[in-house]
């Protein structure tokens, strides 16, 4: 029995399903999860000593690669002065100033510890600011596991939930909790216009992943985001970009810089923690003024602005501002997507791939999907076979056909060539 299997068997005795986040259980693809012991650069090693080229990157944060020496040093130096204070620090101010500088739509920002906290707090703030209740979200978009957002959501819910019903995607969420959440089709401008016409003056906020990454990778169209911006402005609704995944990942200023659309509020996470638990929400100064202790919208967190996370995040934000960083990252990610598509064509496998900045999507279907419905037309059985074949050849992809992948600055041409070699063998087996 492998060491990975031994650990999985042991974990299931004390941890529900043996994991602390459902997608890690390999339920979607089958088989035994890999228990990771260490990581460096573009590589991870499991409990059996197997090395993998990593295309998960902790689901996005590891944009400069694992265990970057400067990030490690910053965390070590900070840890020498204690792990947490429960009081303000100067580093928090520096982090806030850096975020506001790099994302101009954010005039003020509040640090939290997870993406779920960021989106949950942003929606509460939008409702408090507008005095309205109704929220619009989109099919397949995942905004964390807050109750009101678990309706036709993406990520692990595409494996575990019934996505055909316009009802809570998770047990334990009363229908009453989600009755103020309207779910529309991603990239459907007409449906969005109809919703605003029918519910004029009632909509508190529209929340969207401008590049969806939790139903695999799906780009928003320019027309979709532009219509969203115009409708929110006209109706007085708050436009929230959930950039927990795309922030500092698809461009230095996030997806909003990529598209040239200015939201009212933005949620950030992943990259801003450099691999440590950190997230943030921010936006217009007048909206943020409604937040306690200034206003009546309450939000708090014992570990918000944690010194270790801020140290890792600030160092990562410094590294990604190096000249040409995003040009190189986008070029390598596009090269990966194109190379995998070419390998699939050579093997006669129906397949398409897409890339935005440092994110990519792999689809076992003809054509790149533009909606949740199109994503679900992918051949998941074929993906599962491909996933395991790649794993056997030392390439670690997301263990689900409904998750985006991530490239780091450490994925050089040699790493991509090794990936293509593995893919040619894997497509033959798929």
From Swiss-Prot:
It comes from Cupriavidus taiwanensis (strain DSM 17343 / BCRC 17206 / CCUG 44338 / CIP 107171 / LMG 19424 / R1) (Ralstonia taiwanensis (strain LMG 19424)). InterPro entries: 4pyrrol_synth_GluAld_NH2Trfase, Aminotrans_3, Aminotrans_3_PPA_site, PyrdxlP-dep_Trfase, PyrdxlP-dep_Trfase_major, PyrdxlP-dep_Trfase_small. It is an enzyme of class 5 (isomerase). HAMAP family: HemL_aminotrans_3. Its EC number is 5.4.3.8. Pathway: Porphyrin-containing compound metabolism; protoporphyrin-IX biosynthesis; 5-aminolevulinate from L-glutamyl-tRNA(Glu): step 2/2. It is found in: Cytoplasm. One of its GO terms (biological process) is protoporphyrinogen IX biosynthetic process. GO terms for cellular component: cytoplasm. The lineage of its organism: Bacteria, Pseudomonadati, Pseudomonadota, Betaproteobacteria, Burkholderiales. This is Glutamate-1-semialdehyde 2,1-aminomutase.
């Amino acid at each position: 029995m492998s060491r990975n299997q031994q650990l999985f068997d042991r974990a299931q005795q004390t941890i529900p399903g043996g994991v602390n986040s459902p997608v890690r259980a390999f339920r979607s693809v089958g088989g035994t999860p890999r228990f990771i012991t260490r990581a460096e650069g573009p590589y991870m090693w499991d409990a059996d000593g197997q090395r993998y080229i990593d295309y998960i990157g902790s689901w996005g944060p590891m944009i400069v690669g694992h265990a970057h020496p400067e990030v490690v040093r910053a965390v070590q130096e900070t840890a020498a002065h204690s792990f947490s204070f429960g009081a303000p620090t100067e580093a928090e101010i520096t982090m806030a100033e850096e975020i506001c500088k790099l994302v101009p739509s954010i005039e003020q920002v509040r640090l939290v510890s997870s993406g779920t906290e960021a989106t949950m707090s942003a929606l509460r703030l939008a409702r408090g600011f507008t005095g309205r209740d109704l929220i619009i979200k989109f099919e397949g978009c995942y905004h964390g596991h807050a109750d009101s957002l678990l309706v036709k959501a993406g990520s692990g819910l595409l494996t575990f939930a019934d996505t055909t019903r316009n009802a809570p995607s998770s047990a334990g969420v009363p229908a009453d909790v989600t009755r103020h959440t309207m779910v529309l089709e991603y990239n459907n401008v007409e449906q969005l216009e109809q919703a605003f016409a029918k519910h004029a003056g009632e909509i508190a906020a529209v929340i969207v992943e401008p590049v969806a990454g939790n139903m695999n990778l799906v780009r928003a169209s320019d027309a979709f985001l532009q219509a969203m911006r115009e409708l929110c402005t006209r109706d007085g609704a708050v436009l929230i970009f959930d950039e927990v995944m795309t922030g500092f990942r698809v461009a230095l200023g996030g997806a909003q810089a990529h598209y040239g659309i200015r939201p009212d509020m933005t949620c950030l996470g992943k990259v801003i923690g450099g691999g440590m638990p950190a997230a943030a929400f921010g936006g217009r100064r007048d909206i943020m003024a409604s937040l306690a202790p200034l206003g009546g919208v309450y939000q708090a967190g014992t570990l918000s602005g944690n010194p270790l996370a801020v140290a890792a995040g600030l160092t990562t934000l410094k590294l990604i501002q190096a000249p040409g960083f995003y040009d190189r990252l986008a070029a390598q990610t596009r090269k990966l997507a194109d190379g995998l598509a070419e390998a699939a064509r050579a093997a006669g496998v129906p397949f398409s791939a897409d890339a935005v900045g440092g994110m990519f999507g792999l689809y076992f279907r003809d054509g790149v999907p533009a909606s949740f419905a199109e994503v679900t037309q992918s051949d998941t059985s074929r993906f599962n076979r491909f996933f395991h074949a790649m794993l056997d050849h030392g390439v670690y992809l997301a263990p689900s056909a409904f998750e985006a992948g991530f490239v780091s600055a450490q994925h050089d041409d040699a790493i991509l060539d090794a990936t293509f070699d593995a893919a040619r063998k894997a497509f033959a087996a798929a």
